[in-house]
Amino acid sequence: MTEHGTGLLLVMMDIDPEHEDDFNRWYDDEHVPERMAIPGFLTGRRYRAIEGGPKYLAIYEMESPEILDSPAYKYASGQGRSEWTAQVVGRAKNYVRNVYVEM
């Protein structure tokens, strides 16, 4: 495993205020731990916008962007998704997801 990765996954979104508690519980208790269990994911951090939006940002450092093509990631983001994940993701608004590679 490398000391730092060459890939970043950034995900931004808004959630209606009445769903924020559930969203934050899901992110902290289920989603980030699931992602961090995937080989090649190195760090996962969450941020809240001080102003502007989208309000929520998650940044995942990966060994490389190719991790997103791995069977483990494809399973976790496909048929391995929980009902809770489907529910929370279905409430997301202004969803932005970008993958970056170090230059």
Where are these regions (language model features)?
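Macromolecular interaction modules
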Residues: 1-103
